[in-house]
């Protein structure tokens, strides 16, 4: 392998020098995924389309360079890690290509959550439904043959794939859905076709082999390759397509995937049962299965304790918990209410004594119950001892053997020093997960893990089970594929690999082990960095909502980078520190959206703010204090400067770009025509006499301005809902401009100043405009604080609408998501428009107050998918934060206004 050889070859094939530039940061953050392994790649690359992947594999074949494809990085068995060339196939593969009535075609980087969001309007969904929907990509789900909570083996990736565009190891491309695809396949890969037909005939002719394959795949099974395809399909093209499912990047690359769709059932009822012990719960399993529910999820007592530590257990559950209690979630779904009611009645009759929540249909409570299970892995992993790495095992046994399996697994964990394990899983399918943790700091601990694994393998196989049900073989179970399949079928697995990948360059070491001890090598050591992020298990749930994903780093990658910074030698630390200034700091919007999806409630933005504060000097902290003291004047002058710039837009744009070119990156704001320059003095806003409401206009009004605010206040006064505005607010600011930049002393002074003001208004409900200002101010006191759009939604929504809007497109804000204020924007939009659209691709715009002016590529990156989704939509576009409106206007090229302005237009 020659890393320079493959880069030189890629340059000859048309890759730019910029795209081939290597980064120490990227190598280190891509050396880890959600698994317990760590392998640093020699080379990294981002692919933008299937043609680039074709050229990458052509170059890799010519230079014998190992290639590993990395998408969501949420896999738990080490299959997205490699020593050769690691290729990101998420950032550039985000298109939902075509939605039809029975199928959807999408690129592999689209998360399952976002894909289902696009299908929601048609009441359809894809089959695989892993707990990691927000992180798991379509390519990863198919590559691992993901299943999940409800799909079982009936609707998993294998069962629902229709076709794909496949890139073979030598770079050749085959579209399996073209009319002449089989003919083309035979011409393109005659040796592969012949070998597939030979293996098919061999398995079918041998009754014992056929029976064993059937047995192995009756349960969930992600060990080895999908050998059941040789029994399920005659046509080599169909065998090819289904062998790719679960192949974990070892047979080729899926550049575009077509999946069959399932209907979303119209009504659902969720039940939560508590049994006195794990054994009693498992003994009840066959009776529960006989009721034919859509899902059965088990959580043992240790799981419940971990959930309780995060305050995620409802009081009703806590009240009935005993020492060994085990919870089971059972869900029924149907297309008709009566059908659902009948199923629920039958179930309640059998299990009335165990039901804590019965037949829950209200979405908020249903979601709360399911959040317990979906976030469980990361929450349990958070509770691990400091400095240890979490290992989530994943096995399947016949459901009737679950009781003995759980009992024996618990005994094994105790025997090998892991204590009482955490056990949970999809028990309808006999699929259980159990978590252990270890620091692997000594040879003795590694030996303990080796002995534990050997005993676990023996136990599961003795029960007729499978060693990996959902998480893929990866490196974790590759040495045990022969034990799972037997010698004869293992030889067939090796023949499949050889036929697809004769040079062995595709993800070597995955599925077919590089050594018998591969599962004991390259084990991840977790470094302690900061209390804010130390509980991170690197699951990747945070990544899909991050505005810098695909541009620089994601929240998980920022955390990993700083973990690596703490352990690397001085020479690497120097380079890493330099790269992280832009990749980790300057391109972090600190919006906190990562916390929304994080199961353990980590706000990486807070961590980055802390880093910024540490990097501030005495001089910059002092200048921050001066700015805070004179903030009213600064905001007013900034507004005037923007108005002047608006009069000479070309000069302003050119001048700011020239200045930015000669100053350090991120120091000079770049003027844009999307900037609204209507700043006004807050003292001119109309104040009413009110004992109930006090309005604190944000300083953004001085800078950018929203003239509709004055009209909102006038309408409120006229409608008998007057709003009082305190005097002397010239210097008022929530403090976000200081906290976001790490100017802690200035922020503390502003917070102290605000405290006196808020105390004087403690008898009133506080109102502030702008969702980001609302979020910050809400955290500074216990006084009820609402965003101005919430005031309108709660008090003025009955005012008659005179002009209804045809279609409104909403851009929810990250801060509005955190506080719940986005719901007010939705309510107002539904009141004034016939049609309201929330884009499936919305995420934080990355403007972050002024970050979009300082690092404009951040906003362009963050808004690109949302802009593309809406390119042909004729609508009024609104949001509820002035900086976000500027960011969205600039990023999409379409003007965004405030929801308040839209409402004022409609009622005036």
Regions found by a protein language model. Name each.
Residues 518-538, 568-590:
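Ferredoxin-like iron-sulfur electron-transfer modules
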Residues 293-386, 421, 425, 555-563, ...:
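Terminal amphipathic helices with adjacent charged low-complexity linkers/tails
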Residues 504-510, 541-565, 587-614, 776-778, ...:
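Iron-sulfur cluster-binding cysteine motifs and their immediate structural context
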Residues 501, 604-908:
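Iron-sulfur cluster-binding electron-transfer modules in prokaryotic oxidoreductases
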Residues 512, 518, 549-583, 601-627, ...:
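Non-heme iron-sulfur electron-transfer modules
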Residues 35-67, 89-130, 146-198, 263-276, ...:
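N-terminal glycine-rich flavin-associated loop
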Residues 36, 76, 119-163, 168, ...:
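A gly/ser-rich beta-alpha-beta helix-loop segment of oxidoreductase catalytic cores
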């Amino acid at each position: 392998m020659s890393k320079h050889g493959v880069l030189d070859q890629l340059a000859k094939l048309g890759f730019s020098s910029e795209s081939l530039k290597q980064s120490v940061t990227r190598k280190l953050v891509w050396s880890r995924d959600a698994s317990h392994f760590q392998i640093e790649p020699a080379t990294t690359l981002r692919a933008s389309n299937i043609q680039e992947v074709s050229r990458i594999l052509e170059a890799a074949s010519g230079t014998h360079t190992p290639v590993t494809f990395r998408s969501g990085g949420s896999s738990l068995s080490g299959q997205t890690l490699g020593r050769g060339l690691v290729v990101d196939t998420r950032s550039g593969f985000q298109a939902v290509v075509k939605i039809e009535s029975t199928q959807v075609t999408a690129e592999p980087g689209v998360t399952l959550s976002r894909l289902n969001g696009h299908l929601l309007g048609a009441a359809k969904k894809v089959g695989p439904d892993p707990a990691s929907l927000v992180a798991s990509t379509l390519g990863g789900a198919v590559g691992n043959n993901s299943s999940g909570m409800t799909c079982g083996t009936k609707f998993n990736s294998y069962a629902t794939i229709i076709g794909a565009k496949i890139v073979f190891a030598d770079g050749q491309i085959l579209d399996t859905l073209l009319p002449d695809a089989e003919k083309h396949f035979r011409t393109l890969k005659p040796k592969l076709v012949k070998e597939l037909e030979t293996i098919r005939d061999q398995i079918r002719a041998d009754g014992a082999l056929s029976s064993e394959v059937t047995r192995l795949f009756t349960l969930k099974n992600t060990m080895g390759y999908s050998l059941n395809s040789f029994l399920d399909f005659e046509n080599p093209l169909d065998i090819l397509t289904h062998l790719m499912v679960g192949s974990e990047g070892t047979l080729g690359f899926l550049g575009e995937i077509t999946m069959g769709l399932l209907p979303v059932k119209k009504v659902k009822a969720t039940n939560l049962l508590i049994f006195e012990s794990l054994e009693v719960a498992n003994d009840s399993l066959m009776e529960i299965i006989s009721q034919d529910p859509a899902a059965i999820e088990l959580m043992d007592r240790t799981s419940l304790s971990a959930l309780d530590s995060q305050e995620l257990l409802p009081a009703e559950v806590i009240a009935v918990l005993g020492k060994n209690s085990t919870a089971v979630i059972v869900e029924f779904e149907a297309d008709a209410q009566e059908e659902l009611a009948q199923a629920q009645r039958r179930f309640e009759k059998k299990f009335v004594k165990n039901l804590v929540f019965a037949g829950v249909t209200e979405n908020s409570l249903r979601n709360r119950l399911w959040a317990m299970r979906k976030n469980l892995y990361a929450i349990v992993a958070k509770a691990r001892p400091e400095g240890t790495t979490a290992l989530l095992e994943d096995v399947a046994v016949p459901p009737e053997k679950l009781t003995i399996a759980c009992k024996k697994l618990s005994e094994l964990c105790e025997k090998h020093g892991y204590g009482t394990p955490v056990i949970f899983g999809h028990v309808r399918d006999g699929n259980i997960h159990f978590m252990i943790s270890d620091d692997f700091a000594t040879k003795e601990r590694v030996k303990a893990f080796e002995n534990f694994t050997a005993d676990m393998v023996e136990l599961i196989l003795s029960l007729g089970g499978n060693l990996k049900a959902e998480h893929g073989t990866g490196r974790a179970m590759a040495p045990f594929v022969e034990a799972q399949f037997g010698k004869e079928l293992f030889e067939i697995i090796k023949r499949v690999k050889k036929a697809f990948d004769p040079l062995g360059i595709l993800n070597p070491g995955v599925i077919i082990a590089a050594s018998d001890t591969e599962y004991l090598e390259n084990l991840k050591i977790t470094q302690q960095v900061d209390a804010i992020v130390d509980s991170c298990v690197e699951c990747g749930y945070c990544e899909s909502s991050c505005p810098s994903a695909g541009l620089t780093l994601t929240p998980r990658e920022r955390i990993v980078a700083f973990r690596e910074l703490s352990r690397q030698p001085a020479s690497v630390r120097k380079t890493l520190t330099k790269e992280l200034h832009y990749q980790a700091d300057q391109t972090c919007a600190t919006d906190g959206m990562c916390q929304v999806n994080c199961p353990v409630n980590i706000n990486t933005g807070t961590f980055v703010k802390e880093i910024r504060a540490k990097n501030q000097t005495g001089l910059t902290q002092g200048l921050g204090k001066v700015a805070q003291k004179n903030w009213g004047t600064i905001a007013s002058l900034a507004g005037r400067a923007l108005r002047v710039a608006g009069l000479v837009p070309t000069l302003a744009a050119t001048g700011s770009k020239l200045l930015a070119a000669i100053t350090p990156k991120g120091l000079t704001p770049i003027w844009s025509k999307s900037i609204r320059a209507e700043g006004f003095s807050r003292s001119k806003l109309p104040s009413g006499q009110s004992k109930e409401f006090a309005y604190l206009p944000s300083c953004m009004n001085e800078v950018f301005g929203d003239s509709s605010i004055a009209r909102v206040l006038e309408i409120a006064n006229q409608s008998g809902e007057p709003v009082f505005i305190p005097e002397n607010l010239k210097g008022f600011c929530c403090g976000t401009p200081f906290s976001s930049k790490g100017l802690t002393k200035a922020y503390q002074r502003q917070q102290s100043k605000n405290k006196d003001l808020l105390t004087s208004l403690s008898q009133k409900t506080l109102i502030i405009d702008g969702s980001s200002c609302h979020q910050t101010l809400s955290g500074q006191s216990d006084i009820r604080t609402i965003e101005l759009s919430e005031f309108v939604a709660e008090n003025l929504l009955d005012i008659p609408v005179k002009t209804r809007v045809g279609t409104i497109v909403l851009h929810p804000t990250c801060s509005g998501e955190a506080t719940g204020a986005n719901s007010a924007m939705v309510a107002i939009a539904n009141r004034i428009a016939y049609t309201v659209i929330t884009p499936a691709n919305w995420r934080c715009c990355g403007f972050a107050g002024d970050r979009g002016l300082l690092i404009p590529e951040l906003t362009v990156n963050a808004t690109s998918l949302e802009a593309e989704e809406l390119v042909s939509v004729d609508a009024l576009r609104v949001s509820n934060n002035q900086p976000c409106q500027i960011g969205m206007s600039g990023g999409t090229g379409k003007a965004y206004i405030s929801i308040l302005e839209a409402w004022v237009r409609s009622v005036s």
